[in-house]
A protein has these predicted regions:
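Ligand-binding pockets and gating/stacking loops
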Residues: 2-430
């Protein structure tokens, strides 16, 4: 829906910094409406820092300075962020059934779920997000992010790279016109010794790759399910029948062969030579004590693992926290299945509780350990869902269509203000 510019603050190109001008972000397409008279006005530079500086690994300032303003003091600089955990809800989660319910709207808009009160007066969440509702005084929620493309391919590309696609693309397209935020972060802020700067658990989203930055900035993908009792990251530990010393001898032999002129010349002409980077990356992980420790979830007490939830998403969130502790700059937590054209209510009854538990525990755990000051947690998808519920002719299997005109995005940590809800949709959620 168009935003009333007399009653909002819009981001425009005059605020774009060097990273944006390089094609990483086009903030002119985002608008964050703020009611006139708000105690917390937004300026363009402030909004850009929320969406750009942190995700690109740059310096993060106490952007809004809100706590300092309330206390009558000067805004303080937050410490340089060390990590970002990017919770990607693939398919486009419904804002109605998550962070922006409309309890007073007609039933065909509000849906089946009830809404519940949160820690902030007048702000309500879905009934299935009870843990996050009880702690929303510890994160910022933006309810008015939007763009203009309702196809998955273009929407994902835009949200993961900050740039529109060069031409219209369909829902099933895999587009990579620009490097992703994770790849840019890995290039600007390399990972700790022996570890990549960019991990994806359990898979890389479409448009989540490095594009022209090169394969060395692609995410290291961890497909294994850490919720399984036999979880073992196969690329981090050598095969059980092969010791690390034998792996090292193989590596030396491979290096000697690569130095042969004909092998070297053939490799130089072969685009597949990027596999060398992955081979070396795997070896570095095998020989890194920090990596071995980060992936050893058995070091965690059962109480901590239970708190995150004994689900694939919950245990991956715990693994993400351990990677943050190891110094990894960017971790994507991929959770699919949010494209709810049909069966939206039974689907989300199953999906929301694990998300609620994992995300709330992750934020709380990082905060308790003093890591939230230097870790940005972001939760989002490629778009929201349409206001009006659609049904098959039989009246069964209701769902919601794609809606790029409004979505909710959660930000926690790295100096982002606590307890703020920015922007708004109208009474119908459009």
């Amino acid at each position: 829906m168009p935003v009333d510019r007399a009653n909002s603050v819009a981001l425009n190109r005059s605020a774009v910094g060097p990273a944006s001008r390089a094609g990483l972000v086009d903030p002119a397409q985002f608008e964050l409406p703020v009611p006139l008279g708000s105690r917390h006005p937004l300026d363009r530079r402030t909004c850009l820092r929320l969406g750009l500086s942190v995700l690109a690994g740059g310096r993060m300032v106490d952007m809004f300075g809100l706590a300092a303003q309330a206390a009558g003091s000067q805004p303080a600089l937050a410490r340089r962020p060390t990590s970002c955990i990017f919770v990607w809800l693939d398919g486009g989660p419904s804002h109605f059934e998550t962070f922006d319910p409309k309890p007073d709207a007609p039933r065909e808009i509000r849906g089946e779920f009830d809404s519940i009160a949160t820690r902030i007066a007048g702000v309500r969440f879905s009934e299935h997000l009870g843990r996050l509702a009880a702690m929303n005084d510890r994160f910022t929620l933006v309810r008015s992010i939007r763009h203009t493309d309702s196809n998955h391919g273009a929407g994902i590309h835009y949200m993961l790279t900050g740039a529109p696609t060069r031409m219209p693309v369909g829902c099933n397209s895999y587009v990579s016109d620009h490097p992703s935020l994770g790849a840019v972060t890995a290039r600007e802020r390399p990972g700790p010794s022996g570890m990549p700067g960019y991990f994806a658990l359990p898979e890389m989203p479409r448009s989540g790759g490095p594009n022209f930055l090169g394969a060395r900035y692609a995410p290291f993908i961890v497909p294994d399910d850490p919720n399984r009792s036999d979880f073992r990251m196969h690329d981090v530990a050598p095969p059980q029948a092969v010791g690390l010393s034998r792996v090292e001898r193989r590596r030396q032999l491979r290096s000697q062969l690569d130095r042969l002129p004909r092998v070297r010349d053939a490799a130089a002409a072969d685009p597949a030579r990027a596999s060398d980077a992955f081979y070396e990356q795997s070896y570095q992980l095998m020989s890194s004590p920090a990596a071995q420790q980060a992936f050893d979830l058995e070091r965690e007490p059962d109480s901590v693992r239970d708190a995150y939830g004994r689900t694939p998403l919950g245990q991956r969130a715990l693994l993400a926290r351990r990677l943050v502790e190891a110094g990894v700059p960017f971790i994507t937590l991929f959770d699919g299945g949010w494209d709810s054209h049909v069966d939206i209510f039974p689907t989300l009854r199953d999906k929301l509780p694990p998300l609620d538990q994992a995300l709330a525990t992750l934020i709380d755990d990082l905060d308790t350990r003093g890591l939230l000051e230097t870790t940005l947690v972001v939760a989002l998808g490629e778009f929201g869902r349409a206001p009006k519920i659609t049904q098959l002719p039989t009246g069964k299997f209701p769902g919601r269509e794609h809606w790029p005109g409004a979505m909710s995005v959660l930000f926690a940590g790295c100096g982002t203000p606590r307890g703020l809800v920015l922007g708004a949709t109208d009474r119908l959620g459009s």
